[in-house]
Amino acid sequence: MSNEFSLNAEKRDVQGKGASRRLRRVDGKVPGIIYGGETAPVAISVSHNQLSHALQNEAFYSHILTLDVEGTNESVILKDLQRHPYKPIIMHADFLRVQKDQKLHVNVPLHFINEDKCEGVRQGGGSISHQQTEVEVICLPANLPEFIEVDMTSVQVEQILHLSDLKLPEGVELAELTKGSDHDLPVVAVHKPKGAKADEAEGEGEAE
């Protein structure tokens, strides 16, 4: 993984809604928690500006992060993020400890490549419809991908790519597919324009 992310954090001794509100309003910090593994959960706070800046990078959401908690480094992933419903404020952040020998369940983004070369669009006049923009993967920390590529070059009109069609890095599996074949969800499709379908139906009616 090419990107590296590190955040500074401080331990929180005082907790509760009032204390969290003061952290955000007065100190410009985001309350959070580190949990998981055999170590007890730790209540922390991180800089709102630093976290907001990091969140602008898509890779931050699917990357192993380093939290420097008053001089002690913790390897974590961002597990949950609570935002204000209408203000650009991060309310709370949950970080899950990472252990190199334990598999992670992480959502990673899909990158659709070569859409401009898609045969179903260039030759068939179709349009691309995305059903999924991210997928949940299961893997060891060392195998965690920042994203999964979906090559659209050879996708034809009325063709649908499912989860089982995705090319995964070694050591990575899709959480949905572990639940059975009925969870092989559609990811992306190339459809004919509605007008073209109507014209075809009309032509078939005249031929009869």
From Swiss-Prot:
GO terms for biological process: translation. The keyword RNA-binding applies. Pfam families: Ribosomal_L25p, Ribosomal_TL5_C. Residues 1-21 are annotated as: Disordered. GO terms for molecular function: 5S rRNA binding; structural constituent of ribosome. The keyword rRNA-binding applies. GO terms for cellular component: cytosolic large ribosomal subunit. Keywords: Ribonucleoprotein, Ribosomal protein, RNA-binding, rRNA-binding. Coiled coil: none annotated. InterPro entries: Rbsml_bL25/Gln-tRNA_synth_N (IPR020056), Ribosomal_bL25/Gln-tRNA_synth (IPR011035), Ribosomal_bL25_b-dom (IPR020057), Ribosomal_bL25_C (IPR037121), Ribosomal_bL25_long (IPR001021), Ribosomal_bL25_short (IPR020055), Ribosomal_L25_dom (IPR029751), Ribosomal_uL5_bac-type (IPR020930). NCBIfam families: bL25_bact_ctc (TIGR00731), PRK05618.1-2 (NF004128), PRK05618.1-5 (NF004130), PRK05943.1 (NF004612). This is one of the proteins that binds to the 5S RNA in the ribosome where it forms part of the central protuberance. Part of the 50S ribosomal subunit; part of the 5S rRNA/L5/L18/L25 subcomplex. Contacts the 5S rRNA. Binds to the 5S rRNA independently of L5 and L18. HAMAP family: Ribosomal_bL25, Ribosomal_bL25_CTC. Belongs to the bacterial ribosomal protein bL25 family. CTC subfamily. This is Large ribosomal subunit protein bL25. It comes from Hahella chejuensis (strain KCTC 2396).
